[in-house]
A protein has these predicted regions:
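Intrinsically disordered, low-complexity linkers and terminal regions
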Residues: 1-67
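Nucleic-acid modification enzymes, centered on SAM-dependent nucleic-acid methyltransferases
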Residues: 46-142, 150-514, 533-560, 574, ...
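Conserved SAM/SAH-binding loop
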Residues: 146
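Hydrophobic beta-strand segment of the Class I
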Residues: 521-522
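A short glycine-rich, Lys/Arg-flanked "PGG" loop and its adjoining helix->strand segment in the class I
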Residues: 568-584, 609
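Conserved beta-strand signature within the Rossmann-like core of class I S-adenosyl-L-methionine
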Residues: 586-592
Length: 642
């Protein structure tokens, strides 16, 4: 890591890590990378349950040890030894269940910095950590997802953030909350201001990577400066792909087409006034069952002025009354420049372009130059690496394969967005910079649907959450613009000031934490068949070069031949690990969000088999209708866990 990325307190000079001093943060990283490289050569190390699928090179490129490894983290024991406090039965610990219902929105800038399927607002988790822990305590999240528990643990040391939760903090760092009894209110002490340390792990490489980006301090201004330099370099490679002619004549279009055909990086500004593409609308093309004529969905089915898609519409060729279900998509075969083989996909054509000239926006129907430029970008391959992993079999992955023939990761991107993303990715030399790739790589794809809002086609829009669904009307955003937007949002990380978390990539069942070493755990585990994480994460993980090992994924899935009972067994094994790691008498909070009684019964059984006892149920409103379950580790008697 360049020292300029670190927070101002560590910007240059010696740094301390796990009790040892290093000349610089870069020296620290290089030292631990060498140790990790040696560890990766150990066959037994790679046998740890949940070890991701990836090369040593890719794992090392992503990792920032000891704080984060894109594989099982071999430095967790060192972290606990350095920061943890041994269990002492003579030290009193008596915390009552946290009875208050919690409501926290999901609109905090830090919460929105990087997308992920399910996220608990870190401000909500802070309330639980403050209730059950003291400054410096170790907090575990064994299903860490995007790492909100780590953020919450660290921000318990931020006076301003703690006070924003409605608490009071006195000059000595005592935290008070308001309580009412018999109509009288008073402020009672219940915690202390101070950061807690966290141990985060997740089976998914992209989840642990996002957790790393959230929990790693950086100088946001220097980070943005470096990222903007990379973006400028990438735009020099592919900026030409997002130009369009403004009010061209027929002659100018013809001249532009010739320029596009003859030049590898055509500059159309010499032909006509040009604009920069904001987004392009793509439409499915169907075949009429009566005359076999082409039916462009946008042209035939969409009521442009009314802002709706008609259920019934006429064939433009024969006039037959059609519905979307009565037609079949038109397919075509072409040479895939990345696979080097012929593939077959559903036809989608550009039907509208939104662009700007200066600061003014315009819309147009694609002209001959636009079609030729798009054709060029779809058929070329640059020297920059792009993920071409084949989609695994699954519930979510089946839809894009069957509907549009998208069989590999790179198929989810238009030619120019694929080239743009690859160009930026190739120039990111540190994993923190690659977080900008993952910020856009799942969302800015052919999953992004066109919508009609406030009287305008193209306003709003987005992908369907929890799916890989490809809509019939796709809004292709300018990837360079989206990367620029991602860079501008990095200011929200200013609250993260120190490396108080250690992050591992592995299954909960395989993690090795010394018994009786954790002070509190907050987890948000998968629930039955709610979300197929490994399938949805595949696009993201393709870009970082590390894929989830699905064997130990705790879900219910026909594609993986995992029944509800298999899910229960996997959850039991994972919860046993959490149980063993917790100090006696300590607490774990488990959030759940599944309305199926059978799934909840399976979870209850898993909890009981792991040794937990339910103490309280309370609502956790994150504007998604979910709940949490509070549990307590029983006090041991004669060394036996009851």
């Amino acid at each position: 890591m360049n020292d300029l990325f670190k927070a101002p307190t560590n910007a240059s000079g010696p740094v301390e890590c796990l009790g040892q001093m290093y000349p610089s943060d870069q020296a620290r990283r290089e030292h631990f990378l060498k140790l990790l490289a040696i560890k990766l050569k150990d066959p037994d190390f790679r046998k740890i349950e949940g070890f991701p699928m990836g090369t040593d090179e890719d794992i090392l490129a992503l990792s920032d040890p000891p704080y984060y490894t894109a594989c099982p983290n071999p430095f967790i024991a060192d972290f606990i030894k350095h920061y943890g406090k041994p269990y002492d039965s003579s030290v009193p610990y008596n915390k009552e269940p946290f009875f208050a219902d919690v409501s926290e929105g999901k609109y905090d800038p830090l919460y929105k910095l990087h997308p992920y399927h399910t996220k608990v607002p870190h401000r909500a988790i802070m309330r639980y950590i403050l209730q059950y822990t003291a400054p410096g305590d170790l907090v575990q999240d064994a299903f860490a997802g995007s790492g909100a528990t780590g953020i919450a643990a660290q921000l318990c040391g931020n006076r301003e953030v703690v006070q924003s939760l409605g608490y009071k903090v006195d000059p000595d760092g005592i935290v008070y909350r308001e309580e009412s009894e018999d109509g009288k209110t008073s402020w009672l002490p219940f915690s202390r201001l101070g950061a807690r340390k966290s141990i985060l792990s997740d089976l998914s490489p992209i989840a642990s990577f996002i957790a790393y980006t959230y929990n790693t301090p950086s100088d946001s201004h220097e980070f943005q400066r470096e990222a903007q330099e990379i973006l400028s370099e990438a735009e020099r490679v592919g900026g030409w792909m997002f130009q369009t002619l403004h009010n061209p004549t027929t002659e100018q279009i013809s001249s532009a087409v010739s320029e596009i055909k003859s030049d590898d990086t055509p500059d159309l500004s010499e032909t006509c006034l040009t604009g920069r593409v904001n987004y392009t609308v793509w439409s499915d093309v169907f075949s009429c069952p009566e005359c076999a004529g082409d039916v462009v969905f946008w042209d035939s089915a969409v009521d442009k002025e009314g802002g709706k898609v008609n259920d019934h519409f006429p064939c433009p060729s024969c006039g037959a009354s059609l519905t979307k279900r009565s037609m079949e998509r038109k397919w075509h075969k072409f040479m895939d420049p990345y696979l080097g083989q012929v593939v077959e996909q559903a036809v989608q054509v550009p039907v509208m372009i939104n662009y700007k000239v200066g600061k003014k926006r315009f819309q147009k129907t694609p002209d001959g130059a636009d079609i030729e430029l798009i054709k060029k970008t779809e058929s070329i391959r640059t020297g920059d690496w792009c993920p071409t992993f084949a989609l695994p079999s699954g519930f979510n992955t089946r839809q894009p394969i069957e509907s549009h023939g998208l069989t590999h990761v790179h198929h989810f991107y238009t030619g120019r967005n694929r080239i743009a993303l690859a160009a930026f990715n190739a120039r990111c030399k540190h994993p923190l910079l690659k977080s900008l790739i993952t910020t856009v790589a799942f969302r800015i794809t052919k999953r992004y649907g066109l919508t009609y809002q406030a009287g305008v086609w193209g306003a709003g829009g987005g992908p369907t959450n929890g799916t890989l669904y490809i809509p019939s009307l796709v809004k292709e955003l300018n990837m360079f613009e989206m990367l620029d937007n991602a860079i501008s949002k990095c200011e929200s990380k200013a609250e993260i000031q120190s490396s108080d978390a250690i992050i591992s990539t592995q299954s909960t069942q395989g993690i090795e934490i010394p018994p009786n070493s954790i002070d509190y755990a907050f987890i948000d585990p998968p629930f039955g068949a709610n979300i197929m994480y490994s399938e949805l994460n595949f696009l993201w993980e393709g870009w970082i070069g590390a894929l989830t090992d699905r064997k130990s994924e705790a879900i219910e899935s026909k594609a993986q031949s995992k029944s509800l009972n298999d899910y229960r067994k996997l959850m039991t094994d994972g919860l046993k690990k959490v149980f063993e790691a917790l100090k006696p008498g300590r607490w774990v909070t488990i959030e759940f969000s599944n309305t199926q009684a059978s799934v909840w019964n399976a979870i209850q059984t898993a909890l009981q088999e792991a040794g937990f006892v339910v103490a309280n149920v309370a609502a956790l409103d994150k504007q998604k209708g979910s709940f949490n379950r509070l549990l307590k580790y029983p006090t041991p008697m004669r060394g036996t866990l009851l």
